[in-house]
Design a protein with these regions (language model features):
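Short, conserved catalytic or interaction motifs in soluble domains
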Residues: 9, 55, 82, 133, ...
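Alpha-helical elements of the RecA-like P-loop NTPase motor core of helicases
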Residues: 15, 40-41, 90, 155, ...
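Conserved N-terminal alpha-helix of the aminotransferase class I/II PLP-enzyme fold
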Residues: 1-12, 16
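Active-site region of PLP-dependent enzymes
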Residues: 110-116, 123-199
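PLP-dependent aminotransferase-like
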Residues: 19-107, 114
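Short active-site oxyanion
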Residues: 2-3, 27-28, 143
Length: 199
């Protein structure tokens, strides 16, 4: 993808992604019933209600059941790629586009997996990874990463993960050394030690 940013953990990655997409109280987010608690935790922490779709024969989101769960409160879909496999992203993206929904991939258990020669994390609007030691690519403690090709979403996620702050460019083109809090955010950065270990 064009853009990526390190965050504190995979749960934060999902929550930051949801908030960047404008998900909040009164909204619903569709995900699969076969997932770890953090997927649902992120949805609830964003203020939304999780709605579940059953799995297919590969224990991944059954995209054939997806459209029946969509209503006027639905804001996003979180397909969960598991066991090194990718969900049926062609069908999921088609349904999302038809209904004007964001697709946020949960890639915590699919590092390196591909779908039609594209890696997971590059198939939806946003990809969210976890580097917890039990994951396919584990760090030395918690860590997470977010990927996207959308600069607007990337800029918003950069602010959210750093206490809602941004730096302003001066007319000279140089960055002003001061930070400005422009929205609500959190403190969730991938620290240098974990990043260095994973390199």
């Amino acid at each position: 993808t064009k853009y990526g940013l390190g965050v504190g953990n995979g749960t934060d990655a999902l929550e930051i992604a949801l908030k960047a997409c404008g998900v909040g109280p009164g909204d619903e987010v569709i995900t699969t019933s076969n997932t770890a608690v953090p997927t649902v935790t992120a949805i609830v922490n964003a203020g939304a209600k999780p709605c579940f779709v059953d799995v297919d024969e590969f224990y991944l989101m059954n995209s054939n059941l997806l459209e029946n769960k969509i209503n006027n409160k639905t804001k996003a879909i979180i397909p969960v790629h598991l066991y090194g496999q990718s969900c049926n992203m062609k069908n999921i993206n088609k349904i999302a586009k038809k209904n004007n929904l964001y697709v946020i991939e949960d890639c915590a258990q699919s590092h390196g997996a591909t779908y039609n020669n594209k890696t997971t994390g590059s198939l939806g609007d946003i990809g969210c990874f976890s580097f917890y030691p039990t994951k396919i690519l584990g760090g030395y403690g918690d860590g997470g990463f977010i990927t996207t090709n959308n600069q607007k979403l990337f800029d918003k996620m950069m602010r959210i993960r750093f206490l809602g702050m941004e730096r302003k460019k001066m007319s000279s083109g140089h960055w002003n050394g001061k930070y400005y809090a422009v929205e609500h955010g959190t403190n969730s950065r991938l620290d240098e030690v974990h990043a260095a270990i994973m390199l």
